[in-house]
Amino acid sequence: MVTVTRSPQEFIDQLRRTQSDLLARLEPDATLRPDDPKLDLKTLLKAALRNEMEAVEIAARWIPRTGDAELKLALARQVGDEARHYRLIQERLRELGESLAGFNPLAQGYSPLFQYLDGLTDPIEQVAAGQFTREAIALVKNTQFIAHCVALGDQKTAA
């Protein structure tokens, strides 16, 4: 028998602290700055397309795996949100003169994070890992990307 010694709020607070400590490792700007000079803004935006497509696909894969109607609807909303993000990035690339003809964001396969998330079967794990942790990682990286765009003088992409 497992004895619960923490309240739900204490668990959430501990999860947030642990997550914050781990995500702090992503914060140095050097983690965003490309080592390869070929990784310019357009290349970084194409990498963002991959991230958005993976977010679309993982949420879509989880819909038929859950029996909870509310979770199905939340995942469906997430699919739509991530698809909208994909379209916004796609449009910005076109404005920058980048042709996406023949571009496949998943041509190099799925990321290790996607593969891990795809293996989760428990809805609680999916929500914790997919919704909270993945979005927290995205928040850190998006903040860095915005700062990078501002430093390049590209206010439109930063917006």
Language-model segments: what does each one mean?
Residues M1-A159:
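Non-heme di-metal
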